Amino acid sequence: MSAHIINGTEIAAAIREEIRSEVTALKTKAGIVPGLATVLVGDDPASHSYVDSKIKMCQNLGIYSEHHPLPQNATNEDLLTLIAKLNADPKISGILVQVPLPAQISESLVLNAINPDKDVDGFHPVNVGRMCLGEPCFLPCTPHGVQELLIRSGIKIEGTHVVIVGRSNLVGKPLANILLQKAPGANATVTICHSGTKNLPEITRQADILVAAMGKPKFITADMVREGAVVIDVGTTCIGYTPEGKRILSGDVDFEEVKEKAFAITPVPKGVGPMTIIMLMLNTLTAAKRAVGLIK
């Protein structure tokens, strides 16, 4: 029997309507409009596409947006000056600097310059520390999206063994921290695997919930998955193009093989991807509410 397909597009659409209602209410009752500033350095097509999708989503939800493009040869000082301006701008609730950045730019220097209260990507050390301590913070968008996918799909997380394959600062590490918290929608036993892990299939087969987040197309095969497990595929690698020039994406899981063994599985596309951008919008809304003391 094939697995239940967890449709991230449908779940993200439901959250989108919740956010739209809150944005409208915030405008009507308090005269507050959440605002997101995006910063893009250079002309990378993929980065342009990602930023465009975020701007369109802001427009769709009634969130104010500003886009600040900078040339490929921009300096650290250029970015720091812009970020200081955005930090001080009351119209801007959240700031997103699209990564990766050109080689001459210090990513850590730039991201750490963002006011933690406007760090809607959840990358600032202050927010990372708060996340680890279980304090109110901005959660990184993709890991938070994974958690919401599980919760809204009715999948129990508490008391389960979650195995995460991948230890990146963007997904693996923060997701582990989120899911091990003593909190609703978490409280799992978490194992992180990586390139140095021995006997990887033995460990992945122990997972009640298996998360693949290493960026290796179809790396997770059926023999690595326990019968009845929940499989979340975070991978999105471009493996080619259609004759029309559209990107062909592959996840980290061999979907066709694994879906015959898993209880539930996310596809690529239409799985985790749509959740990432909607969590960014949720963080932007949260930032606007915190800025005026509506929430902590």
Curated annotation (Swiss-Prot):
CDD domains: NAD_bind_m-THF_DH_Cyclohyd. One of its GO terms (biological process) is tetrahydrofolate interconversion. One of its GO terms (cellular component) is cytosol. Its EC number is 1.5.1.5, 3.5.4.9. InterPro entries: Aminoacid_DH-like_N_sf, NAD(P)-bd_dom_sf, THF_DH/CycHdrlase, THF_DH/CycHdrlase_cat_dom, THF_DH/CycHdrlase_CS, THF_DH/CycHdrlase_NAD-bd_dom. Pathway: One-carbon metabolism; tetrahydrofolate interconversion. It holds the Pfam family THF_DHG_CYH_C. It catalyses: (6R)-5,10-methylene-5,6,7,8-tetrahydrofolate + NADP(+) = (6R)-5,10-methenyltetrahydrofolate + NADPH; (6R)-5,10-methenyltetrahydrofolate + H2O = (6R)-10-formyltetrahydrofolate + H(+). Keywords: Amino-acid biosynthesis, Histidine biosynthesis, Hydrolase, Methionine biosynthesis, Multifunctional enzyme, NADP, One-carbon metabolism, Oxidoreductase, Purine biosynthesis. Gene3D superfamilies: Leucine Dehydrogenase, chain A, domain 1, NAD(P)-binding Rossmann-like Domain. NADP(+) binds at residues 166-168, 195, 236. GO terms for molecular function: methenyltetrahydrofolate cyclohydrolase activity; methylenetetrahydrofolate dehydrogenase (NADP+) activity. Catalyzes the oxidation of 5,10-methylenetetrahydrofolate to 5,10-methenyltetrahydrofolate and then the hydrolysis of 5,10-methenyltetrahydrofolate to 10-formyltetrahydrofolate. Homodimer. Belongs to the tetrahydrofolate dehydrogenase/cyclohydrolase family. This is Bifunctional protein FolD. The gene is folD.
